[in-house]
């Protein structure tokens, strides 16, 4: 982002002229790709999702509860602004990323034995569902993403609270320990 500011004197889309779809500046396209990768990393979407299961498994439950929701919702809010003023190529890329995130998240969760790793892969799938709301860009998409975000907030906080309590009482970490 500092390169964008240094080259164009600002970070608004009017300064950069990225939203008109006519840019042929390959350096600008490369920088935009790097910014996109940064946001995909922030919201834990595929293919930038490989860090999520390890962090969720190793970190304390209250920290994981925070990381599972708030950075994802903040990144999605920024993504809404980015997609609204971008060209169609970015939208197509986000559609592919959302589908890959949903598939990778669900298939990865299916194979897990550790409950926190399973929820990590579930979080990757949730990122894909939120990205679908972004690229649909109809009159209800922002409201749907906001509603989904509220549900994600309460369900993830509730799930990690239950995991925290049960892991303290029963020393449970694996899925079979919770049965």
PLM regions: where:
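Alpha-helical transmembrane segments of multi-pass membrane proteins predominantly involved
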Residues: 1-179
